[in-house]
A protein has these predicted regions:
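Recognition helix of helix-turn-helix/homeodomain-like DNA-binding domains
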Residues: 26-41
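Short basic helix-loop element that most often maps to the first helix and adjoining turn
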Residues: 4-24
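Conserved hydrophobic/aromatic packing and binding residues within compact polymer-binding modules
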Residues: 6, 21, 32-35, 61
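DNA major-groove recognition helix of helix-turn-helix
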Residues: 10, 36, 54, 65
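DNA major-groove recognition helix of helix-turn-helix/homeodomain DNA-binding modules
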Residues: 45-60
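Short amphipathic recognition helices of helix-turn-helix/homeodomain-type DNA-binding modules
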Residues: 60-66
Length: 66
């Protein structure tokens, strides 16, 4: 299963609430909520957009859980 570290990144690196973080990365709050809670994996466009906004590699945010 694909997992992400969005909440960890938001809380430790940016110290923002989710609404502020959504504005920073340029996605809708409901989309972000679905991603952060692992209810949705996101499409490739959204994944790349977030990666670019955070200046991180995709694999630094998303990973395969063993």
């Amino acid at each position: 299963m694909v997992k992400n570290k969005l909440k960890e990144i938001r809380m430790t690196k940016y110290m923002m609430n989710s609404n502020e973080f959504c504005k920073l990365i340029g996605i809708k709050a409901n989309t972000y909520s679905q991603l952060e809670t692992q209810k949705q994996q996101g499409n490739i466009e959204t994944i790349l957009k977030i990666s670019k906004a955070l200046n991180l590699k995709v694999e630094d945010i998303w990973y395969l859980e063993d």
